[in-house]
Amino acid sequence: MAVWIQAQQLQGDALHQMQALYGQHFPIEVRHYLSQWIEGQAWDSIDLDNPQENIKATQLLEGLVQELQKKAEHQVGEDGFLLKIKLGHYATQLQNTYDRCPMELVRCIRHILYNEQRLVREANNGTSPAGSLADAMSQKHLQINQTFEELRLVTQDTENELKKLQQTQEYFIIQYQESLRIQAQFAQLAQLNPQERLSRETALQQKQLSLEAWLQREAQTLQQYRVELAEKHQKTLQLLRKQQTIILDDELIQWKRRQQLAGNGGPPEGSLDVLQSWCEKLAEIIWQNRQQIRRAEHFCQQLPIPGPVEEMLAEVNATITDIISALVTSTFIIEKQPPQVLKTQTKFAATVRLLVGGKLNVHMNPPQVKATIISEQQAKSLLKNENTRNDYSGEILNNCCVMEYHQATGTLSAHFRNMSLKRIKRSDRRGAESVTEEKFTILFESQFSVGGNELVFQVKTLSLPVVVIVHGSQDNNATATVLWDNAFAEPGRVPFAVPDKVLWPQLCEALNMKFKAEVQSNRGLTKENLVFLAQKLFNSSSSHLEDYNGMSVSWSQFNRENLPGRNYTFWQWFDGVMEVLKKHLKPHWNDGAILGFVNKQQAHDLLINKPDGTFLLRFSDSEIGGITIAWKFDSQERMFWNLMPFTTRDFSIRSLADRLGDLSYLIYVFPDRPKDEVYSKYYTPVPCEPATAKAVDGYVKPQIKQVVPEFVSASADSAGGSATYMDQAPSPAVCPQPHYNMYPQNPDPVLDNDGDFDLDDTIDVARRVEELLGRPMDSQWIPHAQS
C-alpha cells in the first residue's frame, strides 16, 4: 500500500507529527496530489555530498514542477478553478525556492518520506507484528545508509589523525635536523680556545641531551600515532568489508535473482540506481582510505622507526586492494540479459554496466567489452581459473563494444545492439539429453584501469544460461530448459547445475508466474487449476491439492517423458495452452469465460444440473493447444456433447466469439451467464447488404459459418421436427439477415456416438471449408483466387 494512503490514516500525536513535516518549504497539498509520483522517484539514489549529483536533483525538481503544472491544468469546474490557481502557485513557489539548490529539495523530501514511513511503521506495529516487506526493505536501506554515515565519520577521523601525524612528524624532522646541527657544532669547537670551548661544549651538551630525550619521547609518540592509525584503518576496513558484503552479496545478488525470475515472467528486477549509489559510496570511501594508507606508508618510509607498523600497513594495504578488486569485478554486471532462447542467424541485444565507473574515473579511458559464447563446461573451467583463453563454442558477429559514460545519469555502460550468433559448436551430449537441454552462456570481458593506471583489473561476467536453437520448432523445449533453470537455480551454484527434482509447490509457483506473463493476465492459476495439472502430471485422481504438496517432479516428468497415453510431454501440453490463450483467447480468459483446466468427466459433472444450452470451454486432453466446447442438451441420443478441439490454426480462420455466435443452441456460459452478454462485444460485425446487391465482377462473396451437422440433426429428431442445420441462426449480429455461402454438408460425423470425439474420424466444418478452397477449381475461378 502507498505510504501516503497509510499516512492519512494516522491518528493523534502521530498525525500531528506527520502534519508538522510540511509547510512553506513543501506544502502538504503537493504531497497529496502528487503522492504516486513522489513515491515513485529514486530520492535515495542521490548522493547529497556529491556536487555532480546536482544534475539528477535538478531533473527531479523540473519533474515535480511539471507534474504540478499538469495536475493544475486538469482541474475543471468551480472547485477545480481554485485548486488550479493553488497548484500553479505551488509550482512557481517550489521552482523559486529550490532552483539554485535542488539538493535541498531532495534532502527535504527524503526527510519527509523517511519520517512518514517511520510513523506508519510505528502505528502498524500492533496490527502487523512481522511488518510488511516494504517496511523491512526500508529498514534495511536505513541501516545501510546509517553504516555509510558511520564510515564517513571514521574516514574523516582517520584523515584528521593522519594530518596530526603529518604535523607531528614534520616537527620531529625539524628537531632532528636541529640535533644534527648541534653535532656539527661540536666538530667546530676544536677551533676555539680551551676556555671558550669548554663553556660552549657544556651548553651544547645540555642542549643535545635535552633534544635527544625529546626526540626519543617523540619517536615513541610518533610510533604510537602510527600504530593507532593503522588499528583504526583495520577497524574501518572490517566495517567496509561488512558493508560491501551486504551490498554485493545480499542486495546485488537479490537483484540478479529478480532478474533471473523476470526471465520466467516475474516482476521486473527494478532499477539499479540505488545499488549504483551504494556502490559509488563504497568506491569513494574505499579509495579515500586507500589514499590514507598510502600516505601513512610514505610517512614511514620518510622517517623509518623500528616497530610493527610496517607489517600492519602492508596488511591493510593488501586488504584494501582486495576490497576494491572485489568491488570493481562484482559491479561489472549485465543490465539487460541476452535472450535465453537464442536462435542462430538472428539479431539480439544485451547491455553491460559498471556500477562504479563514474566514481573511479574508469570512463576517462573508455574500456572495450568483448562478448563470446562458451559452453557449460567452459564456464566451469573459467570459474576455476583454468586457462580457457580463446576457447569458445561459437562465433558472434558485432561482439565488441566501447563503454560509454552518460553524464546525466552517471552510468557507464556498453550497449550491444546488433549481435548475431553466426554458428554454434555443440559438445557431446549426456544420455537422453537433447540439443534443447544443452546450456551455453555469453561471456562479457574487459579491462579497467583505476586511479590513472595505478590498478588494472581484468573483469568478466557471465550471462544467464542460454539455449541455442536453429529452428523455431525447438523453441518450446528450449523454453522448458530455461524455465527450469531460472526457477530452481541455487545461489553460488557451479554452472549451470540445477536440481533434477523439485517439489510440486515449487513447480506450481514457476508455472503460475510464467502463465500470467505469457498470457499477460492478472488471472493466474487457481487452486482448482493446479489440482487439474497435478492430476495430469502424476496420473492421479486425487482432487485435494494438499495431497500433492510432498510430491516431487523430476525434469524427465516435466519435459522428457511423454504423458501416459499421449505423444507429448507435460510442458508441451501446458505451453500449447499458453500459446493459444496468448494469441487468440486472452480477453476471454481475462473475462473468466474459459474454465479451461477441467477434463471431460469433470465438465459433464459440472453441466449435469444446468439447463440445456449451458456450455463451457476446456483445454483439450488430446491435442496440444486445443480448446473444446462441452455443452448440455438432453436428446434421445445423449445428454453431453463435446466438439472437436479448435487450435490456433482454426482461430486464424474464424474467432472463438464468432464460432460461438454461430451456434445459437449454446445459450449460457457456465455457470449461468448469457452467452451474448459475455461474447457479443467480440463478434465480428457483418456488413449489411441489400438482397438486390449485385455481385462485383460476377462474383458473390463467401462467408464461413460454424456448424455442427450431427448435433442439429440429433436435436431436430429429438424435437420431432424436420429442421436442417442451416435453420440454426447465429446470435444477433450487425446485419439482421446475414448471407452465408452454402457448402455441402460434411458426411463425416463430428461427434462419436458415445460423446467422445475422434481426431481420425471427425473434421471441423471450418477446416473442411479451408480444404475445399484449396482444391483445384474450374478455370473461371482461378483469376479470383489470384486477385
From Swiss-Prot:
<dbReference type="InterPro" id="IPR035886">
    <property type="entry name" value="STAT5b_SH2"/>
</dbReference>
<dbReference type="GO" id="GO:0001553">
    <property type="term" value="P:luteinization"/>
</dbReference>
<keyword id="KW-0539">Nucleus</keyword>
<dbReference type="InterPro" id="IPR046994">
    <property type="entry name" value="STAT5_CCD"/>
</dbReference>
<dbReference type="InterPro" id="IPR013799">
    <property type="entry name" value="STAT_TF_prot_interaction"/>
</dbReference>
<feature type="domain" description="SH2">
    <location>
        <begin position="589"/>
        <end position="686"/>
    </location>
</feature>
<dbReference type="GO" id="GO:0005737">
    <property type="term" value="C:cytoplasm"/>
</dbReference>
<keyword id="KW-0010">Activator</keyword>
<dbReference type="GO" id="GO:0007259">
    <property type="term" value="P:cell surface receptor signaling pathway via JAK-STAT"/>
</dbReference>
<dbReference type="GO" id="GO:0030155">
    <property type="term" value="P:regulation of cell adhesion"/>
</dbReference>
<dbReference type="GO" id="GO:0046983">
    <property type="term" value="F:protein dimerization activity"/>
</dbReference>
<keyword id="KW-0597">Phosphoprotein</keyword>
<dbReference type="InterPro" id="IPR015988">
    <property type="entry name" value="STAT_TF_coiled-coil"/>
</dbReference>
<dbReference type="GO" id="GO:0045579">
    <property type="term" value="P:positive regulation of B cell differentiation"/>
</dbReference>
<dbReference type="InterPro" id="IPR008967">
    <property type="entry name" value="p53-like_TF_DNA-bd_sf"/>
</dbReference>
<dbReference type="InterPro" id="IPR036535">
    <property type="entry name" value="STAT_N_sf"/>
</dbReference>
<feature type="modified residue" description="Phosphotyrosine">
    <location>
        <position position="90"/>
    </location>
</feature>
<dbReference type="Pfam" id="PF01017">
    <property type="entry name" value="STAT_alpha"/>
</dbReference>
<dbReference type="GO" id="GO:0060397">
    <property type="term" value="P:growth hormone receptor signaling pathway via JAK-STAT"/>
</dbReference>
<dbReference type="GO" id="GO:0071364">
    <property type="term" value="P:cellular response to epidermal growth factor stimulus"/>
</dbReference>
<comment type="similarity">
    <text>Belongs to the transcription factor STAT family.</text>
</comment>
<dbReference type="GO" id="GO:0007565">
    <property type="term" value="P:female pregnancy"/>
</dbReference>
<dbReference type="InterPro" id="IPR000980">
    <property type="entry name" value="SH2"/>
</dbReference>
<dbReference type="GO" id="GO:0045944">
    <property type="term" value="P:positive regulation of transcription by RNA polymerase II"/>
</dbReference>
<dbReference type="GO" id="GO:0045648">
    <property type="term" value="P:positive regulation of erythrocyte differentiation"/>
</dbReference>
<dbReference type="GO" id="GO:0006952">
    <property type="term" value="P:defense response"/>
</dbReference>
<keyword id="KW-0238">DNA-binding</keyword>
<dbReference type="InterPro" id="IPR048988">
    <property type="entry name" value="STAT_linker"/>
</dbReference>
<dbReference type="GO" id="GO:0042104">
    <property type="term" value="P:positive regulation of activated T cell proliferation"/>
</dbReference>
<dbReference type="GO" id="GO:0005829">
    <property type="term" value="C:cytosol"/>
</dbReference>
<feature type="modified residue" description="Phosphoserine">
    <location>
        <position position="128"/>
    </location>
</feature>
<dbReference type="GO" id="GO:0046544">
    <property type="term" value="P:development of secondary male sexual characteristics"/>
</dbReference>
<dbReference type="Pfam" id="PF21354">
    <property type="entry name" value="STAT_linker"/>
</dbReference>
<keyword id="KW-0963">Cytoplasm</keyword>
<dbReference type="GO" id="GO:0000981">
    <property type="term" value="F:DNA-binding transcription factor activity, RNA polymerase II-specific"/>
</dbReference>
<dbReference type="Pfam" id="PF02865">
    <property type="entry name" value="STAT_int"/>
</dbReference>
<dbReference type="GO" id="GO:0001228">
    <property type="term" value="F:DNA-binding transcription activator activity, RNA polymerase II-specific"/>
</dbReference>
<dbReference type="Pfam" id="PF00017">
    <property type="entry name" value="SH2"/>
</dbReference>
<dbReference type="InterPro" id="IPR013801">
    <property type="entry name" value="STAT_TF_DNA-bd"/>
</dbReference>
<dbReference type="GO" id="GO:0003677">
    <property type="term" value="F:DNA binding"/>
</dbReference>
<dbReference type="GO" id="GO:0007595">
    <property type="term" value="P:lactation"/>
</dbReference>
<dbReference type="GO" id="GO:0043434">
    <property type="term" value="P:response to peptide hormone"/>
</dbReference>
